[in-house]
Amino acid sequence: MVKESIPKEGENIKIQSYKHDGNIHRVWSETTILKGTDHVIIGGNDHTLVTESDGRTWITREPAIVYFHSEFWFNVICMFREDGIYYYCNLSSPFVCDEEALKYIDYDLDIKVYPNGKYHLLDEDEYEQHMNQMNYPHDIDVILRRNVDILQQWIEQKKGPFAPDFIKVWKERYKKIRNY
């Protein structure tokens, strides 16, 4: 049995993304925790090493704030680019934390939000393919579709990580913790 452990503010952790079949999908080597509770994890990273399932590696290009919630089937990456804030939202299982990393299952569907507020649902074909290959249960499909709707409402209502104050507060907290 894996012991669950909530990371503390200022701690650096790994983030591990899996696929439904249990295979590792992607690993972010270091994220600094800005807030850690049973329900919400908020972190920050910048120029972080990412390792793909096939062993390829790359480095993130810009600072980002990451948002995970234990009750929703998505997580959000807020990326700070020269032309504004972009959001990349992964439809995923709720997170779990253990002594090794923060972990979740990536369910292929993504929503990309642009600085002007427009957004697009991505990778529906990949989702359908993996749903068939990995035999996603019908219940998972229903939950994910419902969470796509919730996520779109949050985007349109500027709720949670899409609220302007969220970005201001957590970007400043990250700068302070990292001594930028």
Curated annotation (Swiss-Prot):
Disulfide bonds: none annotated. InterPro entries: DUF402, FomD-like_sf, Ntdp-like, SA1684. It is an enzyme of class 3 (hydrolase). GO terms for molecular function: magnesium ion binding; nucleoside diphosphate phosphatase activity; ribonucleoside triphosphate phosphatase activity. Signal peptide: none annotated. Its cofactor is Mg(2+). It catalyses: a ribonucleoside 5'-triphosphate + H2O = a ribonucleoside 5'-diphosphate + phosphate + H(+); a ribonucleoside 5'-diphosphate + H2O = a ribonucleoside 5'-phosphate + phosphate + H(+). Its EC number is 3.6.1.15, 3.6.1.6. The keyword Transmembrane does not apply. Mg(2+) 2 binds at D108, D110, D123, E126. Keywords: Hydrolase, Magnesium, Metal-binding. It holds the Pfam family DUF402. Mg(2+) 1 binds at N90, D106, D110. Gene3D superfamilies: FomD-like. The active site is at R26 (proton donor). Has nucleoside phosphatase activity towards nucleoside triphosphates and nucleoside diphosphates. Belongs to the Ntdp family. This is Nucleoside triphosphate/diphosphate phosphatase. It comes from Staphylococcus haemolyticus (strain JCSC1435). The lineage of its organism: Bacteria, Bacillati, Bacillota, Bacilli, Bacillales.
